[in-house]
Amino acid sequence: MVSILTQLNDHFAQALEGQFPSDVTLPTPLVVPASNPKFGDFQCNIALPLAKQLGQPPRAIAMEIVDKVNLSEICEPLTIAGPGFINIKLLPDYLGEQLIKLQQNQQLGVSLVKGEERIVVDFSSPNIAKEMHVGHLRSTIIGDCLARVLEFRGYDVLRLNHVGDWGTQFGMLITYLKEVYPEALVTADALDIGDLVTFYKQAKQRFDQDEQFRETSRQAVVALQAGDAKSIKAWQLLCEQSRREFQLIYDCLDITIEERGESFYNPFLPGVVELLQEKDLLVEDNGAQCVFLDGFTNKDGDRLPLIVQKSDGGYNYATTDLAALNYRLNTDGAEKIIYVTDAGQANHFAQFFQVAEKAGILTDPTQVVHVPFGLVKGEDGKKLKTRAGDTIRLKDLLTEAVTRARQDLETRLTAEERSETEEFKTEVAQRVGIGAVKYADLSQNRTSDYVFSFDKMLALQGNTAPYMLYAYARIQSISREGGIDFAQMDSGEIVLTEPTELVLAKNLLQFADVIETVEISLLPNRLCDYLYELSKVFNRFYENCPVLKASDPQRGSRLLLCDLTARTLKLGLSLLGIPVLDRM
Protein backbone atom coordinates (compact mmCIF):
# COMPACT_ATOMS: atom_id res chain seq x y z
CA MET A 1 0.00 0.00 0.00
CA VAL A 2 1.39 3.40 -1.03
CA SER A 3 1.18 6.12 1.62
CA ILE A 4 -0.77 9.31 0.91
CA LEU A 5 2.40 11.40 1.14
CA THR A 6 4.09 9.19 -1.47
CA GLN A 7 1.00 9.34 -3.72
CA LEU A 8 0.96 13.14 -3.56
CA ASN A 9 4.68 13.42 -4.28
CA ASP A 10 4.25 11.07 -7.25
CA HIS A 11 1.32 13.12 -8.62
CA PHE A 12 3.28 16.37 -8.36
CA ALA A 13 6.41 14.81 -9.89
CA GLN A 14 4.49 13.44 -12.90
CA ALA A 15 2.59 16.69 -13.45
CA LEU A 16 5.71 18.87 -13.28
CA GLU A 17 7.99 16.64 -15.36
CA GLY A 18 9.40 18.70 -18.22
CA GLN A 19 7.48 21.83 -17.20
CA PHE A 20 10.58 23.83 -16.29
CA PRO A 21 13.88 24.50 -18.13
CA SER A 22 16.36 21.60 -18.00
CA ASP A 23 18.82 23.57 -15.86
CA VAL A 24 16.20 24.01 -13.11
CA THR A 25 16.36 21.54 -10.23
CA LEU A 26 13.09 20.72 -8.53
CA PRO A 27 13.46 20.78 -4.72
CA THR A 28 12.61 17.57 -2.86
CA PRO A 29 10.40 16.50 -1.32
CA LEU A 30 7.75 18.21 -3.41
CA VAL A 31 5.04 17.68 -0.78
CA VAL A 32 5.35 17.65 3.02
CA PRO A 33 2.84 17.39 5.89
CA ALA A 34 1.22 20.73 6.67
CA SER A 35 2.99 22.76 9.35
CA ASN A 36 -0.39 23.86 10.71
CA PRO A 37 -3.62 21.82 10.29
CA LYS A 38 -5.68 24.98 9.73
CA PHE A 39 -3.95 25.37 6.34
CA GLY A 40 -4.74 21.81 5.24
CA ASP A 41 -3.25 18.35 5.49
CA PHE A 42 -0.21 18.70 3.25
CA GLN A 43 1.59 21.52 1.49
CA CYS A 44 3.88 22.12 -1.46
CA ASN A 45 6.49 24.80 -0.71
CA ILE A 46 8.70 24.54 -3.80
CA ALA A 47 7.58 27.83 -5.40
CA LEU A 48 9.87 29.86 -3.13
CA PRO A 49 13.16 28.06 -3.94
CA LEU A 50 12.13 27.84 -7.63
CA ALA A 51 11.63 31.62 -7.69
CA LYS A 52 15.36 32.11 -7.12
CA GLN A 53 16.25 29.78 -10.00
CA LEU A 54 13.64 31.17 -12.42
CA GLY A 55 13.78 34.82 -11.42
CA GLN A 56 9.99 34.95 -11.15
CA PRO A 57 7.59 35.82 -8.30
CA PRO A 58 6.94 32.70 -6.18
CA ARG A 59 3.18 33.23 -6.20
CA ALA A 60 3.14 33.21 -10.03
CA ILE A 61 5.10 29.94 -9.99
CA ALA A 62 2.67 28.49 -7.43
CA MET A 63 -0.26 29.39 -9.67
CA GLU A 64 1.47 27.67 -12.60
CA ILE A 65 2.01 24.53 -10.51
CA VAL A 66 -1.63 24.50 -9.39
CA ASP A 67 -2.72 24.67 -13.05
CA LYS A 68 -0.56 21.64 -13.92
CA VAL A 69 -1.50 19.34 -11.02
CA ASN A 70 -4.84 17.52 -11.10
CA LEU A 71 -5.78 16.09 -7.70
CA SER A 72 -9.56 16.32 -8.02
CA GLU A 73 -10.09 12.72 -6.81
CA ILE A 74 -7.80 13.17 -3.81
CA CYS A 75 -8.30 16.64 -2.43
CA GLU A 76 -10.30 19.81 -2.53
CA PRO A 77 -9.18 22.50 -5.04
CA LEU A 78 -5.61 23.54 -4.24
CA THR A 79 -5.21 26.94 -2.58
CA ILE A 80 -2.26 29.30 -2.42
CA ALA A 81 -1.35 31.09 0.78
CA GLY A 82 1.11 33.90 1.43
CA PRO A 83 3.96 34.28 -1.05
CA GLY A 84 3.39 30.88 -2.69
CA PHE A 85 2.59 28.04 -0.30
CA ILE A 86 0.27 25.50 -1.95
CA ASN A 87 -2.15 23.96 0.56
CA ILE A 88 -3.68 20.51 0.11
CA LYS A 89 -6.83 19.39 1.96
CA LEU A 90 -7.87 15.76 1.49
CA LEU A 91 -11.43 14.78 0.54
CA PRO A 92 -13.40 12.77 3.15
CA ASP A 93 -14.40 10.20 0.49
CA TYR A 94 -10.76 9.70 -0.48
CA LEU A 95 -9.81 9.28 3.18
CA GLY A 96 -12.54 6.66 3.58
CA GLU A 97 -11.25 4.73 0.55
CA GLN A 98 -7.70 4.78 1.94
CA LEU A 99 -8.91 3.56 5.33
CA ILE A 100 -10.67 0.58 3.75
CA LYS A 101 -7.40 -0.33 2.01
CA LEU A 102 -5.61 0.07 5.34
CA GLN A 103 -8.13 -2.15 7.10
CA GLN A 104 -7.49 -4.91 4.55
CA ASN A 105 -3.70 -4.62 4.88
CA GLN A 106 -1.94 -6.84 7.43
CA GLN A 107 1.00 -4.42 7.63
CA LEU A 108 -1.32 -1.42 8.14
CA GLY A 109 0.12 0.24 5.07
CA VAL A 110 3.79 -0.34 5.89
CA SER A 111 5.51 -1.70 2.80
CA LEU A 112 8.11 -4.46 2.93
CA VAL A 113 11.60 -3.82 1.59
CA LYS A 114 12.61 -5.52 -1.64
CA GLY A 115 15.28 -8.14 -1.14
CA GLU A 116 16.62 -9.33 2.20
CA GLU A 117 19.25 -6.81 3.24
CA ARG A 118 21.04 -8.02 6.36
CA ILE A 119 21.38 -5.51 9.19
CA VAL A 120 23.31 -6.19 12.40
CA VAL A 121 22.05 -4.43 15.52
CA ASP A 122 24.68 -4.50 18.27
CA PHE A 123 23.06 -3.67 21.60
CA SER A 124 22.88 -4.36 25.36
CA SER A 125 26.46 -5.69 25.77
CA PRO A 126 26.83 -6.05 29.57
CA ASN A 127 30.06 -7.21 31.20
CA ILE A 128 30.54 -10.67 32.68
CA ALA A 129 30.90 -10.74 36.48
CA LYS A 130 28.97 -7.49 36.78
CA GLU A 131 25.24 -7.02 37.22
CA MET A 132 23.24 -5.21 34.60
CA HIS A 133 22.49 -1.69 35.76
CA VAL A 134 20.18 1.11 34.68
CA GLY A 135 22.68 2.18 32.01
CA HIS A 136 22.16 -1.14 30.23
CA LEU A 137 18.41 -0.47 30.12
CA ARG A 138 18.72 2.19 27.42
CA SER A 139 20.96 0.17 25.08
CA THR A 140 18.84 -2.95 25.55
CA ILE A 141 15.40 -1.49 24.86
CA ILE A 142 16.46 1.06 22.22
CA GLY A 143 18.33 -1.67 20.34
CA ASP A 144 15.41 -4.07 20.66
CA CYS A 145 12.95 -1.45 19.38
CA LEU A 146 15.10 -0.61 16.35
CA ALA A 147 15.51 -4.32 15.59
CA ARG A 148 11.73 -4.83 15.81
CA VAL A 149 11.04 -1.94 13.43
CA LEU A 150 13.63 -3.16 10.92
CA GLU A 151 12.31 -6.74 11.13
CA PHE A 152 8.78 -5.47 10.56
CA ARG A 153 9.98 -3.70 7.43
CA GLY A 154 11.33 -7.00 6.14
CA TYR A 155 15.06 -6.69 6.79
CA ASP A 156 17.09 -9.73 7.82
CA VAL A 157 18.15 -8.53 11.27
CA LEU A 158 20.93 -10.14 13.29
CA ARG A 159 20.67 -9.03 16.94
CA LEU A 160 24.08 -9.33 18.60
CA ASN A 161 25.10 -9.06 22.25
CA HIS A 162 28.79 -8.07 22.32
CA VAL A 163 29.28 -9.01 25.99
CA GLY A 164 32.50 -8.16 27.78
CA ASP A 165 33.65 -11.71 28.49
CA TRP A 166 37.43 -11.35 28.16
CA GLY A 167 40.31 -9.32 29.52
CA THR A 168 42.33 -8.44 32.59
CA GLN A 169 39.32 -8.58 34.91
CA PHE A 170 39.16 -12.37 34.55
CA GLY A 171 42.76 -12.88 35.60
CA MET A 172 42.07 -10.62 38.55
CA LEU A 173 38.85 -12.43 39.53
CA ILE A 174 40.25 -15.94 39.07
CA THR A 175 43.32 -15.06 41.17
CA TYR A 176 41.17 -13.66 43.96
CA LEU A 177 38.71 -16.57 43.98
CA LYS A 178 41.61 -19.05 44.21
CA GLU A 179 42.42 -17.41 47.53
CA VAL A 180 38.98 -16.87 49.06
CA TYR A 181 36.56 -19.30 47.39
CA PRO A 182 38.31 -21.84 45.10
CA GLU A 183 35.13 -23.94 44.87
CA ALA A 184 33.64 -21.26 42.58
CA LEU A 185 36.29 -22.03 39.96
CA VAL A 186 35.39 -25.72 39.65
CA THR A 187 31.70 -25.96 40.61
CA ALA A 188 28.68 -24.63 38.74
CA ASP A 189 26.30 -22.40 40.75
CA ALA A 190 28.72 -22.09 43.67
CA LEU A 191 28.07 -18.34 43.59
CA ASP A 192 25.09 -16.20 42.80
CA ILE A 193 25.59 -13.03 40.78
CA GLY A 194 25.52 -10.80 43.88
CA ASP A 195 28.43 -12.73 45.43
CA LEU A 196 30.30 -12.62 42.14
CA VAL A 197 29.94 -8.84 41.95
CA THR A 198 31.13 -8.47 45.55
CA PHE A 199 34.18 -10.63 44.88
CA TYR A 200 34.86 -8.65 41.70
CA LYS A 201 34.92 -5.36 43.67
CA GLN A 202 37.22 -6.88 46.29
CA ALA A 203 39.50 -8.27 43.58
CA LYS A 204 39.65 -4.87 41.89
CA GLN A 205 40.62 -3.24 45.18
CA ARG A 206 43.44 -5.77 45.67
CA PHE A 207 44.54 -5.31 42.05
CA ASP A 208 44.83 -1.54 42.52
CA GLN A 209 46.73 -1.76 45.81
CA ASP A 210 48.83 -4.95 45.73
CA GLU A 211 51.69 -5.23 43.20
CA GLN A 212 52.19 -8.97 43.82
CA PHE A 213 48.46 -9.64 43.32
CA ARG A 214 48.56 -7.53 40.15
CA GLU A 215 51.42 -9.60 38.73
CA THR A 216 49.73 -12.91 39.63
CA SER A 217 46.55 -11.66 37.93
CA ARG A 218 48.47 -10.87 34.77
CA GLN A 219 49.95 -14.37 34.78
CA ALA A 220 46.42 -15.76 35.14
CA VAL A 221 45.38 -13.79 32.05
CA VAL A 222 48.34 -15.20 30.13
CA ALA A 223 47.34 -18.74 31.18
CA LEU A 224 43.77 -18.06 30.09
CA GLN A 225 44.90 -16.71 26.72
CA ALA A 226 47.19 -19.73 26.28
CA GLY A 227 44.21 -22.06 26.71
CA ASP A 228 45.15 -23.56 30.09
CA ALA A 229 42.40 -26.12 30.81
CA LYS A 230 41.77 -25.13 34.46
CA SER A 231 41.72 -21.44 33.60
CA ILE A 232 39.31 -22.00 30.72
CA LYS A 233 36.96 -24.04 32.92
CA ALA A 234 36.98 -21.36 35.63
CA TRP A 235 36.31 -18.66 33.02
CA GLN A 236 33.44 -20.66 31.51
CA LEU A 237 31.79 -21.16 34.92
CA LEU A 238 31.99 -17.43 35.67
CA CYS A 239 30.57 -16.57 32.26
CA GLU A 240 27.73 -19.06 32.59
CA GLN A 241 26.72 -17.67 35.98
CA SER A 242 26.47 -14.15 34.56
CA ARG A 243 24.76 -15.40 31.43
CA ARG A 244 21.91 -16.94 33.44
CA GLU A 245 21.40 -13.67 35.31
CA PHE A 246 21.38 -11.69 32.08
CA GLN A 247 18.78 -14.05 30.65
CA LEU A 248 16.43 -13.38 33.57
CA ILE A 249 16.52 -9.69 32.66
CA TYR A 250 16.05 -10.40 28.96
CA ASP A 251 13.09 -12.67 29.69
CA CYS A 252 11.52 -9.97 31.85
CA LEU A 253 11.98 -7.38 29.09
CA ASP A 254 11.03 -9.83 26.29
CA ILE A 255 14.37 -9.37 24.55
CA THR A 256 15.67 -11.78 21.92
CA ILE A 257 19.40 -11.47 21.33
CA GLU A 258 22.28 -13.72 20.27
CA GLU A 259 25.35 -13.62 22.48
CA ARG A 260 28.65 -13.27 20.69
CA GLY A 261 31.13 -11.94 23.20
CA GLU A 262 34.54 -10.37 22.80
CA SER A 263 36.22 -13.76 23.29
CA PHE A 264 34.66 -15.02 20.05
CA TYR A 265 36.97 -12.75 18.07
CA ASN A 266 40.22 -13.70 19.86
CA PRO A 267 41.50 -15.90 17.00
CA PHE A 268 41.16 -12.99 14.57
CA LEU A 269 43.04 -10.33 16.57
CA PRO A 270 46.58 -11.07 15.27
CA GLY A 271 45.21 -10.81 11.73
CA VAL A 272 43.85 -7.33 12.45
CA VAL A 273 47.28 -6.15 13.62
CA GLU A 274 48.91 -7.69 10.54
CA LEU A 275 46.40 -5.96 8.26
CA LEU A 276 47.03 -2.57 9.86
CA GLN A 277 50.78 -3.20 9.56
CA GLU A 278 50.40 -4.03 5.86
CA LYS A 279 48.43 -0.81 5.34
CA ASP A 280 51.28 1.09 7.06
CA LEU A 281 48.87 2.49 9.65
CA LEU A 282 50.65 1.40 12.84
CA VAL A 283 52.97 3.61 14.86
CA GLU A 284 54.82 2.43 17.97
CA ASP A 285 54.15 4.65 20.97
CA ASN A 286 55.65 3.73 24.36
CA GLY A 287 55.86 0.12 23.21
CA ALA A 288 52.22 -0.01 22.08
CA GLN A 289 51.04 -0.35 18.48
CA CYS A 290 48.73 2.58 17.70
CA VAL A 291 46.94 4.31 14.86
CA PHE A 292 47.03 8.11 14.92
CA LEU A 293 44.23 9.91 13.12
CA ASP A 294 43.70 13.50 12.09
CA GLY A 295 40.94 15.28 13.96
CA PHE A 296 41.43 13.48 17.28
CA THR A 297 43.54 15.48 19.72
CA ASN A 298 43.84 16.08 23.45
CA LYS A 299 43.53 19.49 25.13
CA ASP A 300 47.18 20.24 24.30
CA GLY A 301 46.59 19.60 20.61
CA ASP A 302 48.48 16.29 20.53
CA ARG A 303 46.99 13.56 18.37
CA LEU A 304 45.21 10.84 20.33
CA PRO A 305 46.16 7.23 19.59
CA LEU A 306 43.80 4.36 18.94
CA ILE A 307 45.68 1.53 20.67
CA VAL A 308 45.37 -1.84 18.91
CA GLN A 309 48.13 -3.76 20.74
CA LYS A 310 49.39 -2.87 24.19
CA SER A 311 53.05 -2.83 25.17
CA ASP A 312 52.65 -6.22 26.91
CA GLY A 313 51.35 -7.78 23.69
CA GLY A 314 47.71 -7.77 24.76
CA TYR A 315 44.95 -6.37 22.59
CA ASN A 316 42.62 -3.47 23.20
CA TYR A 317 38.85 -3.39 22.69
CA ALA A 318 39.38 -1.36 19.50
CA THR A 319 41.18 -4.38 18.05
CA THR A 320 38.23 -6.57 18.97
CA ASP A 321 35.83 -4.07 17.39
CA LEU A 322 37.81 -4.14 14.14
CA ALA A 323 37.85 -7.96 14.13
CA ALA A 324 34.12 -8.04 14.88
CA LEU A 325 33.38 -5.59 12.08
CA ASN A 326 35.40 -7.64 9.61
CA TYR A 327 33.59 -10.84 10.67
CA ARG A 328 30.15 -9.25 10.49
CA LEU A 329 30.78 -7.93 7.01
CA ASN A 330 32.52 -10.92 5.47
CA THR A 331 31.01 -13.88 7.33
CA ASP A 332 27.62 -12.60 8.52
CA GLY A 333 27.09 -10.71 5.26
CA ALA A 334 25.95 -7.51 6.94
CA GLU A 335 25.21 -4.54 4.71
CA LYS A 336 24.56 -2.21 7.63
CA ILE A 337 25.67 -2.34 11.27
CA ILE A 338 24.02 -0.31 14.02
CA TYR A 339 25.84 0.11 17.34
CA VAL A 340 23.62 1.20 20.25
CA THR A 341 25.78 2.57 23.08
CA ASP A 342 25.98 5.57 25.38
CA ALA A 343 27.03 8.91 23.92
CA GLY A 344 30.29 8.75 25.88
CA GLN A 345 31.61 6.25 23.32
CA ALA A 346 31.03 8.57 20.34
CA ASN A 347 34.72 9.44 20.06
CA HIS A 348 35.74 5.78 20.09
CA PHE A 349 33.32 4.90 17.31
CA ALA A 350 34.40 7.85 15.18
CA GLN A 351 38.04 6.68 15.47
CA PHE A 352 37.18 3.02 14.99
CA PHE A 353 35.11 3.71 11.85
CA GLN A 354 37.88 5.86 10.37
CA VAL A 355 40.54 3.19 10.99
CA ALA A 356 38.24 0.55 9.45
CA GLU A 357 37.94 2.68 6.31
CA LYS A 358 41.68 3.31 6.06
CA ALA A 359 42.38 -0.42 6.53
CA GLY A 360 39.93 -1.34 3.77
CA ILE A 361 37.72 -3.32 6.16
CA LEU A 362 34.86 -0.88 5.67
CA THR A 363 34.05 -0.04 2.06
CA ASP A 364 31.10 1.48 0.21
CA PRO A 365 28.17 0.87 0.18
CA THR A 366 28.30 -0.74 3.64
CA GLN A 367 26.98 1.51 6.39
CA VAL A 368 28.05 1.65 10.02
CA VAL A 369 26.03 3.81 12.39
CA HIS A 370 26.62 4.70 16.01
CA VAL A 371 23.29 5.25 17.78
CA PRO A 372 24.21 7.21 20.93
CA PHE A 373 22.00 7.81 23.93
CA GLY A 374 22.11 10.06 26.99
CA LEU A 375 22.08 9.39 30.72
CA VAL A 376 19.25 8.28 32.99
CA LYS A 377 19.02 10.80 35.80
CA GLY A 378 17.32 10.83 39.17
CA GLU A 379 14.75 13.44 40.12
CA ASP A 380 17.60 15.45 41.66
CA GLY A 381 18.99 15.92 38.15
CA LYS A 382 22.07 13.78 38.85
CA LYS A 383 22.99 10.37 37.43
CA LEU A 384 20.49 7.83 38.79
CA LYS A 385 21.94 6.13 41.89
CA THR A 386 20.78 4.41 45.07
CA ARG A 387 20.62 6.42 48.31
CA ALA A 388 23.97 4.89 49.20
CA GLY A 389 25.43 6.29 45.98
CA ASP A 390 25.69 2.94 44.17
CA THR A 391 24.58 2.27 40.61
CA ILE A 392 20.99 1.00 40.56
CA ARG A 393 20.69 -2.65 39.60
CA LEU A 394 18.39 -3.13 36.63
CA LYS A 395 16.79 -6.15 38.31
CA ASP A 396 15.79 -4.02 41.31
CA LEU A 397 14.44 -1.22 39.15
CA LEU A 398 12.21 -3.57 37.13
CA THR A 399 10.97 -5.33 40.27
CA GLU A 400 10.00 -2.00 41.82
CA ALA A 401 8.18 -0.94 38.63
CA VAL A 402 6.01 -4.07 38.76
CA THR A 403 5.43 -3.67 42.51
CA ARG A 404 4.29 -0.07 42.07
CA ALA A 405 2.06 -1.01 39.13
CA ARG A 406 0.46 -3.68 41.33
CA GLN A 407 -0.13 -1.14 44.13
CA ASP A 408 -1.73 1.31 41.68
CA LEU A 409 -3.96 -1.46 40.33
CA GLU A 410 -5.07 -2.54 43.82
CA THR A 411 -5.93 1.08 44.67
CA ARG A 412 -7.94 1.46 41.46
CA LEU A 413 -9.80 -1.84 41.98
CA THR A 414 -10.77 -0.77 45.49
CA ALA A 415 -12.00 2.61 44.26
CA GLU A 416 -14.03 0.95 41.48
CA GLU A 417 -15.26 -1.81 43.83
CA ARG A 418 -13.97 -4.41 41.37
CA SER A 419 -12.80 -7.90 42.18
CA GLU A 420 -10.23 -9.58 39.94
CA THR A 421 -8.32 -12.87 40.04
CA GLU A 422 -4.73 -13.08 41.19
CA GLU A 423 -3.76 -14.16 37.67
CA PHE A 424 -5.34 -11.00 36.21
CA LYS A 425 -3.61 -8.72 38.73
CA THR A 426 -0.22 -10.38 38.17
CA GLU A 427 -0.44 -10.05 34.38
CA VAL A 428 -1.64 -6.43 34.45
CA ALA A 429 1.03 -5.38 36.96
CA GLN A 430 3.79 -7.07 34.95
CA ARG A 431 2.76 -5.59 31.60
CA VAL A 432 2.00 -2.13 32.92
CA GLY A 433 5.14 -1.95 35.09
CA ILE A 434 7.61 -3.17 32.48
CA GLY A 435 5.78 -1.37 29.67
CA ALA A 436 5.91 1.89 31.64
CA VAL A 437 9.68 1.62 32.12
CA LYS A 438 10.24 0.87 28.43
CA TYR A 439 7.93 3.60 27.19
CA ALA A 440 9.34 6.24 29.54
CA ASP A 441 12.76 5.63 28.03
CA LEU A 442 11.76 5.21 24.39
CA SER A 443 9.49 8.28 24.43
CA GLN A 444 12.51 10.52 25.05
CA ASN A 445 14.78 11.63 22.25
CA ARG A 446 17.51 9.05 22.81
CA THR A 447 20.29 11.64 22.41
CA SER A 448 19.04 13.49 25.51
CA ASP A 449 19.40 12.70 29.19
CA TYR A 450 16.09 12.07 30.94
CA VAL A 451 14.77 12.06 34.49
CA PHE A 452 13.52 8.68 35.74
CA SER A 453 10.25 9.00 37.68
CA PHE A 454 8.05 6.05 38.62
CA ASP A 455 5.15 8.40 39.40
CA LYS A 456 5.20 9.99 35.95
CA MET A 457 5.74 6.80 33.95
CA LEU A 458 2.94 4.90 35.73
CA ALA A 459 0.38 7.72 35.42
CA LEU A 460 -2.83 6.95 33.53
CA GLN A 461 -2.71 10.41 31.94
CA GLY A 462 -0.07 11.96 29.72
CA ASN A 463 2.51 10.47 27.37
CA THR A 464 2.83 7.14 29.21
CA ALA A 465 2.43 3.44 28.47
CA PRO A 466 -0.61 3.14 30.79
CA TYR A 467 -2.38 5.88 28.80
CA MET A 468 -1.84 3.97 25.51
CA LEU A 469 -2.77 0.64 27.08
CA TYR A 470 -5.93 2.17 28.50
CA ALA A 471 -6.94 3.53 25.06
CA TYR A 472 -6.52 0.03 23.62
CA ALA A 473 -8.46 -1.59 26.49
CA ARG A 474 -11.26 0.96 26.01
CA ILE A 475 -11.70 -0.23 22.41
CA GLN A 476 -11.81 -3.86 23.54
CA SER A 477 -14.56 -2.93 26.00
CA ILE A 478 -16.59 -1.61 23.03
CA SER A 479 -16.13 -5.01 21.38
CA ARG A 480 -17.28 -6.86 24.51
CA GLU A 481 -20.20 -4.55 25.20
CA GLY A 482 -21.49 -4.79 21.64
CA GLY A 483 -20.74 -8.50 21.22
CA ILE A 484 -18.57 -7.64 18.22
CA ASP A 485 -15.66 -9.64 16.88
CA PHE A 486 -13.54 -7.05 15.07
CA ALA A 487 -11.66 -9.80 13.22
CA GLN A 488 -14.90 -10.99 11.59
CA MET A 489 -16.14 -7.54 10.52
CA ASP A 490 -16.65 -6.86 6.82
CA SER A 491 -14.78 -3.94 5.31
CA GLY A 492 -18.03 -2.09 4.67
CA GLU A 493 -17.96 1.65 4.12
CA ILE A 494 -16.27 4.38 6.10
CA VAL A 495 -18.27 7.60 6.30
CA LEU A 496 -16.45 10.62 7.70
CA THR A 497 -18.66 13.57 8.61
CA GLU A 498 -17.70 14.66 12.12
CA PRO A 499 -14.51 16.70 12.70
CA THR A 500 -13.12 14.18 15.22
CA GLU A 501 -13.72 11.34 12.73
CA LEU A 502 -11.71 13.19 10.09
CA VAL A 503 -8.84 13.92 12.46
CA LEU A 504 -8.74 10.26 13.58
CA ALA A 505 -8.81 9.06 9.97
CA LYS A 506 -5.87 11.28 9.04
CA ASN A 507 -3.87 10.12 12.05
CA LEU A 508 -4.45 6.46 11.23
CA LEU A 509 -3.17 7.01 7.70
CA GLN A 510 0.14 8.44 8.98
CA PHE A 511 1.39 5.16 10.50
CA ALA A 512 3.45 4.00 7.51
CA ASP A 513 5.19 7.37 7.20
CA VAL A 514 6.03 7.30 10.92
CA ILE A 515 7.59 3.83 10.67
CA GLU A 516 9.68 5.01 7.72
CA THR A 517 10.80 8.02 9.77
CA VAL A 518 11.87 5.77 12.67
CA GLU A 519 13.79 3.53 10.27
CA ILE A 520 15.67 6.47 8.78
CA SER A 521 16.25 8.51 11.94
CA LEU A 522 16.67 5.56 14.35
CA LEU A 523 14.65 7.59 16.87
CA PRO A 524 11.99 5.47 18.66
CA ASN A 525 10.44 8.57 20.24
CA ARG A 526 8.96 9.46 16.83
CA LEU A 527 6.78 6.34 17.12
CA CYS A 528 5.91 7.16 20.75
CA ASP A 529 4.88 10.69 19.78
CA TYR A 530 2.62 9.28 17.07
CA LEU A 531 0.98 6.71 19.36
CA TYR A 532 0.37 9.33 22.04
CA GLU A 533 -1.25 11.67 19.52
CA LEU A 534 -3.34 8.80 18.11
CA SER A 535 -4.53 7.89 21.62
CA LYS A 536 -5.52 11.49 22.36
CA VAL A 537 -7.31 11.83 19.02
CA PHE A 538 -9.16 8.54 19.57
CA ASN A 539 -10.27 9.58 23.06
CA ARG A 540 -11.68 12.84 21.65
CA PHE A 541 -13.47 10.86 18.94
CA TYR A 542 -14.86 8.44 21.54
CA GLU A 543 -16.16 11.30 23.69
CA ASN A 544 -17.83 13.09 20.77
CA CYS A 545 -19.07 10.27 18.52
CA PRO A 546 -21.39 7.52 19.80
CA VAL A 547 -20.30 4.15 18.44
CA LEU A 548 -22.62 1.35 19.56
CA LYS A 549 -25.65 3.67 19.81
CA ALA A 550 -25.12 5.19 16.36
CA SER A 551 -27.25 4.12 13.38
CA ASP A 552 -25.80 2.54 10.26
CA PRO A 553 -23.84 3.40 8.19
CA GLN A 554 -22.21 5.51 10.93
CA ARG A 555 -22.20 2.65 13.45
CA GLY A 556 -20.32 0.29 11.12
CA SER A 557 -18.00 3.07 10.01
CA ARG A 558 -17.12 4.05 13.57
CA LEU A 559 -16.57 0.43 14.57
CA LEU A 560 -14.06 0.16 11.71
CA LEU A 561 -12.32 3.30 12.98
CA CYS A 562 -12.17 1.72 16.45
CA ASP A 563 -10.75 -1.51 15.04
CA LEU A 564 -8.10 0.32 13.00
CA THR A 565 -7.11 2.36 16.04
CA ALA A 566 -6.78 -0.77 18.18
CA ARG A 567 -4.73 -2.56 15.53
CA THR A 568 -2.45 0.45 15.11
CA LEU A 569 -1.94 0.84 18.86
CA LYS A 570 -1.27 -2.88 19.28
CA LEU A 571 1.20 -2.98 16.40
CA GLY A 572 2.90 0.27 17.35
CA LEU A 573 3.31 -0.78 20.98
CA SER A 574 4.59 -4.21 19.93
CA LEU A 575 7.34 -2.47 17.93
CA LEU A 576 8.30 -0.76 21.19
CA GLY A 577 8.33 -4.17 22.88
CA ILE A 578 5.14 -3.51 24.87
CA PRO A 579 2.27 -6.07 24.78
CA VAL A 580 -1.30 -4.76 25.11
CA LEU A 581 -4.05 -5.70 27.58
CA ASP A 582 -7.70 -6.34 26.74
CA ARG A 583 -8.68 -5.25 30.23
CA MET A 584 -6.95 -3.09 32.83
Swiss-Prot record:
GO terms for biological process: arginyl-tRNA aminoacylation. A motif ('HIGH' region) lies at residues 126-136. It holds the Pfam family tRNA-synt_1d. One of its GO terms (cellular component) is cytoplasm. Keywords: Aminoacyl-tRNA synthetase, ATP-binding, Cytoplasm, Ligase, Nucleotide-binding, Protein biosynthesis. Belongs to the class-I aminoacyl-tRNA synthetase family. Monomer. NCBIfam families: argS. PANTHER family: ARGININE--TRNA LIGASE, CYTOPLASMIC, ARGINYL-TRNA SYNTHETASE. This is Arginine--tRNA ligase. It comes from Synechocystis sp. (strain ATCC 27184 / PCC 6803 / Kazusa).
